[in-house]
C-alpha cells in the first residue's frame, strides 16, 4: 500500500502492481466499517506503478472516476540529476464499480507524475521535472488529454541557477484559497 484516500467512508487504496482498491470503511454501502472493512471493487493496469488515487465526480457529466497516478523511475536514476521520470495519470470510469474502465490519460512526454489535486473539474498535477501542470478535465474524458490540448497552464519549477541546475523534482500540487502550493 502506498497512499490511501478516504472520502465519504470509502477508502481508495493505491497498491502499486495490484492497482487501486475501493474499500467500504464506514460508508455502509457494502456493509463495511472501520473495524470491519469490506472490499467493493478494484482496478489494475499493466505498468504496475500505481502510486496515488484521487476519487473524482465530474461536475459537468456526473460521472465518477478514480484518477490514478503512476510513479516510475528509470533503473539507476540519480535524484541529483535531471534524469527523466515516466508515468502518467489514468482516468478510470468507476460509475459502474463492477466494471471500471480506463477512458483517458494525461501524459506529459519525458516527465512522470507524482501527487495531484482536483477541484472544480481542474487537475493540478506535479510532474517531477515537468513542474506543475493545470489540466481542464471537464466534459467527456476520452483518449490522451495532453494531445487534446486540455492543459490550460503550467508552472516551470526548474531553475538553471538551482543547487542542482534544472533538477526540480516537483512532488506536489495542492490548491488552497486560489493558490497552488
Where are these regions (language model features)?
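Feature marking well-ordered beta-strand scaffolds used for ligand recognition
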Residues: 1-181
